[in-house]
């Protein structure tokens, strides 16, 4: 059986300042890659979504399955439950309001269709090595922008 790519993502925001960061740890066999980035005016949910988008954009082949782990219930519930209805309702919520972060959700939708992704929720700060690494990368990205 072919190994699957394992991805851990995390996003965060120091919302009193609006500074946000995201982190990604990709692992495939002995290969691993770490990615991180930041934005000056953002939200926690946008950073969580951005982390998953950046991770999936990094995967060039659609021939290998992906196990994607995130501590964001917003991302997990959105991708597994809400998105189907949003698309039927032309990206409106059940209360007929525009979906927040629709630009990112639409990008994630395209990427999710291009890959065989199994989505997993992992509890944050629970000594999960992959989640801890992604969290550390997101915080390093926020620290970098805080110091500049």
From Swiss-Prot:
<feature type="binding site">
    <location>
        <position position="10"/>
    </location>
    <ligand>
        <name>Mg(2+) 1</name>
    </ligand>
</feature>
<dbReference type="InterPro" id="IPR022892">
    <property type="entry name" value="RNaseHI"/>
</dbReference>
<dbReference type="InterPro" id="IPR036397">
    <property type="entry name" value="RNaseH_sf"/>
</dbReference>
<keyword id="KW-0963">Cytoplasm</keyword>
<dbReference type="Pfam" id="PF00075">
    <property type="entry name" value="RNase_H"/>
</dbReference>
<keyword id="KW-0255">Endonuclease</keyword>
<keyword id="KW-0378">Hydrolase</keyword>
<comment type="function">
    <text>Endonuclease that specifically degrades the RNA of RNA-DNA hybrids.</text>
</comment>
<dbReference type="GO" id="GO:0003676">
    <property type="term" value="F:nucleic acid binding"/>
</dbReference>
<dbReference type="GO" id="GO:0004523">
    <property type="term" value="F:RNA-DNA hybrid ribonuclease activity"/>
</dbReference>
<feature type="domain" description="RNase H type-1">
    <location>
        <begin position="1"/>
        <end position="143"/>
    </location>
</feature>
<feature type="binding site">
    <location>
        <position position="71"/>
    </location>
    <ligand>
        <name>Mg(2+) 1</name>
    </ligand>
</feature>
<comment type="similarity">
    <text>Belongs to the RNase H family.</text>
</comment>
<keyword id="KW-0460">Magnesium</keyword>
<comment type="subunit">
    <text>Monomer.</text>
</comment>
<keyword id="KW-0479">Metal-binding</keyword>
<dbReference type="InterPro" id="IPR050092">
    <property type="entry name" value="RNase_H"/>
</dbReference>
<dbReference type="InterPro" id="IPR012337">
    <property type="entry name" value="RNaseH-like_sf"/>
</dbReference>
<dbReference type="GO" id="GO:0043137">
    <property type="term" value="P:DNA replication, removal of RNA primer"/>
</dbReference>
<feature type="binding site">
    <location>
        <position position="48"/>
    </location>
    <ligand>
        <name>Mg(2+) 1</name>
    </ligand>
</feature>
<feature type="binding site">
    <location>
        <position position="10"/>
    </location>
    <ligand>
        <name>Mg(2+) 2</name>
    </ligand>
</feature>
<dbReference type="GO" id="GO:0005737">
    <property type="term" value="C:cytoplasm"/>
</dbReference>
<feature type="binding site">
    <location>
        <position position="135"/>
    </location>
    <ligand>
        <name>Mg(2+) 2</name>
    </ligand>
</feature>
<protein>
    <recommendedName>
        <fullName>Ribonuclease H</fullName>
        <ecNumber>3.1.26.4</ecNumber>
    </recommendedName>
</protein>
<keyword id="KW-0540">Nuclease</keyword>
<dbReference type="GO" id="GO:0000287">
    <property type="term" value="F:magnesium ion binding"/>
</dbReference>
<dbReference type="InterPro" id="IPR002156">
    <property type="entry name" value="RNaseH_domain"/>
</dbReference>
